[in-house]
Regions:
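Residue-level signal for inorganic ion chemistry
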Residues: 11, 22, 74, 104, ...
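Conserved, non-catalytic sequence blocks in retroelement Pol enzymes and Pol-derived host proteins
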Residues: 38, 63, 131-133
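A structural signal for short hydrophobic beta-strand segments in well-ordered beta-sheet cores
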Residues: 140-143
């Protein structure tokens, strides 16, 4: 049997809506965003209201439950007009997934819907000067001091770091030899 790679009617409708939104709402403001280095919060919330942020996340957490292919289509459509704006979807999807799978349920129920609505803008701190985005080679250390962790080291290339409300930072909590198994998220 052959695999069917055709988009469903729902995927086509979402794709057309996202592409139209990108052309009509995002593309006209590209030069201004590029000059000011900032994405308008109203635009982000509008994307959230259309279900464009975290589309593959469960409906119970504010997503569309639409799957990764649909989410990828949305990201591609938004990137067509402005790659920087597409980071909102990309980071929202990554952070939403991490929280929905690894955070306490009450944290996921509180934070993920705000990400999907575009009310909370997020970033992920993984990349380091010495190892790029190789999670097994992270040097930034997290050491417990009583009830707190103290992070010591460097991160670089945190997309949208100057605009976000929340950031997850990946840091080493165990031996270097343990590679990715000794990495925690803060």
């Amino acid at each position: 049997p052959r695999m069917d790679f055709a988009l469903s009617d729902e995927q086509r409708a979402i794709h057309e809506t996202a592409l139209r939104f990108a052309s009509e709402r995002i593309a006209p403001g590209y030069a201004a965003r590029e000059q000011h280095g900032e994405i308008e919060r109203a635009l982000i919330e509008e994307m959230g209201s259309l279900g464009f942020i975290g589309a593959e996340l469960p409906e119970a957490l504010g997503g569309l439950g639409a799957g990764s292919v649909t989410s990828g289509l949305i990201i591609e459509d938004i990137a067509y007009a402005d790659m920087n704006v597409a980071y909102v979807q990309l980071l929202g999807s990554l952070m939403g997934w991490m929280l929905s799978v690894h955070a306490r349920a009450e944290v996921a129920r509180e934070v993920v819907p705000k990400i999907c609505q575009g009310k909370t803008l997020v970033a992920i701190g993984l990349t380091e000067p010495s190892g790029g985005s190789d999670a097994g080679n992270l040097k930034l250390r997290a050491e417990r001091h009583g009830d707190e962790y103290v992070l010591n080291g460097e991160k670089t290339s945190i997309s949208m770091a100057d605009q976000v409300d929340e950031t997850v930072i990946f840091a080493r909590t165990g031996a270097q030899e343990a590679r990715a198994k000794a990495i925690s998220a803060f």
